[in-house]
Amino acid sequence: MSSTAQIDSALATAISGEQIAGLVAVAADANGPIYQSAFGRRNIADSQRMTTDTVFRIASMTKAITGAAAMQMVEQGKLSLDQPAKEILSFLADTKVLLGFDSQDHPILRAPRTEITLRNLLTHTAGFVYDTWNQAMHKYAQVAGLPAARTGKLEALTAPLNFDPGERWEYGINIDIAGRMVEQV
């Protein structure tokens, strides 16, 4: 069996159950695509076939691209993993840590104990979180009139931290801010 036939067989098997409606696979080298094929349906509830030009919403794929771009900038000496991020993005100089809310629902904020670095941003240890999954940050966004991160508005990147940089890990808008650093440089 040829390599292409083996790949086709494996992918056809992958969609044969009810777990995956359909998929598109592409392999490329420096000269362009060397394999591409589509299998299954675009939607479990729909009979429309998957094609190699089907448009997907692939959440968080920009994180890998942003991480690679940031590390290329580090290799080139244009960014440093441990440089204070506010040296590149001045708006980060005003970033505070959200401690909670007072009895009138005003945010209680303080300055972070450590600097936000590119390393923190790339490892989700800067203190930024998603308002979707963090109740305190969701409340802050409502009280402060801050747009949700999912809107793609740059103002969403001005949210406060949920904890001090380097204190712990939490998934959030960190990579979006790292992406702004790459853009700025």
Protein language model annotation of sequence segments:
Residues 44-170:
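Active-site-proximal loop and beta-strand segments within enzyme catalytic domains
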Residues 1-2, 166:
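Short, low-complexity N-terminal intrinsically disordered segments enriched in polar/charged residues
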Residues 4-12:
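Short amphipathic alpha-helical segments
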Residues 66, 184-185:
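Conserved beta-strand->loop/alpha-helix structural units within folded catalytic cores of enzymes
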Residues 12-49, 81-83, 137-140, 144-145:
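A short, well-structured edge-of-sheet supersecondary motif
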Residues 71-76, 176-184:
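Short glycine/serine- and small hydrophobic-enriched flexible loop segments
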Residues 173:
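Basic, Lys/Arg- and aromatic-enriched nucleic-acid-binding interface segment
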